[in-house]
Amino acid sequence: LKMGAMFVLLLLFTLASSHREGDIQARKTHLKSDFYRTLPRFARGCTISCGYEDNRCQGECHCPGKTNCYCTSGHHNKGCGCAC
């Protein structure tokens, strides 16, 4: 009887521990996707005159139907582009 009780307790502890690890991993994934969602993405179909000046991406960009567009260096894309 003692061995059975010990086995059940060990099994419950193992299940609870793996559930906690899954929750932590899910939270990390959620935070990571939130982080990447906030990074600027290059806009398409814009008139761009962006370039590097003093090691900063600067210039003007005009995107039809969009406001608050600006020159920026993208996260995945190398170079200087337009984000809105």
UniProtKB/Swiss-Prot annotation:
Recorded GO cellular component terms are: extracellular region
Q: Which domain of life is it from?
A: Eukaryota
Provide the protein's localization.
Secreted
Mark which residues the record calls propeptide. Answer: 20-44
Signal sequence annotation: 1-19
Q: In which tissues has expression of this protein been reported?
A: Expressed by the venom duct.
Say if the entry is tagged with keyword Thylakoid: no
How is the protein modified post-translationally, according to the record? Contains 5 disulfide bonds.
Gene Ontology molecular function terms on file: toxin activity
Tell me, in one coarse class, where this protein mainly resides. secreted
Q: Which keywords are on file for this protein? A: Disulfide bond, Neurotoxin, Secreted, Signal, Toxin
Family (UniProt) = Belongs to the conotoxin S superfamily.
Let me see what the UniProt entry remarks about domains: The cysteine framework is VIII (C-C-C-C-C-C-C-C-C-C).
The protein depicted here goes by the name Conotoxin Tx8.1
Q: Which source organism does the UniProt entry give?
A: Conus textile
